[in-house]
Swiss-Prot record:
Stated name of the protein: UPF0316 protein BC_3353
Chief location category: membrane
Membrane topology: Multi-pass membrane protein
Family of the protein in this entry: Belongs to the UPF0316 family.
Keyword annotations of the record: Cell membrane, Membrane, Transmembrane, Transmembrane helix
Organism, as annotated: Bacillus cereus (strain ATCC 14579 / DSM 31 / CCUG 7414 / JCM 2152 / NBRC 15305 / NCIMB 9373 / NCTC 2599 / NRRL B-3711)
Entry's localization field: Cell membrane
CDD domains, per database record: YitT_C_like_1
DNA-binding listed as a keyword: no
PANTHER family registered for this protein in UniProt: UPF0316 PROTEIN YEBE
Pfam families referenced in this protein's UniProt entry, alphabetically: DUF2179, DUF5698
One GO CC annotation: plasma membrane
Amino acid sequence: MLQALLIFVLQIIYVPILTIRTILLVKNQTRSAAGVGLLEGAIYIVSLGIVFQDLSNWMNIVAYVIGFSAGLLLGGYIENKLAIGYITYQVSLLDRCNELVDELRHSGFGVTVFEGEGINSIRYRLDIVAKRSREKELLEIINEIAPKAFMSSYEIRSFKGGYLTKAMKKRALMKKKDEHAS
């Protein structure tokens, strides 16, 4: 019984670590992923080793499987809270909606406006880049000002140039100045 509990706890720890390592790889953060992978591998070997010691012990196998499933739930929760990386939203509007563009820019989001031809009239598309940790804030602004907007989104693996890159460099310089002033 104690072994089954240990296996369950190890799986609850192992699977979220596996989730984080996978996310880091997808986000092109391979060094961090390798470091996390060391811990992941150690936990995996210990947990599976206990199960393989006695394959007739069904409680250990059940603990492994249930722990894995519970670990997936926990890993998904942690991933949503960490919100690593950036996301792009494409927002389609019937009119230019300068109020929305101004509010998004004022809030620090990178926004590019495109004019295009719809089936019946001119349409406008906003390309908005944001940190995933600010996605909720972004959606609240859009829904408040343009509740009928059509939106689609995708995660960004990497980017170069543009407003966000300049803003990040500026924040990094300000942080260094603050550290040296202290």
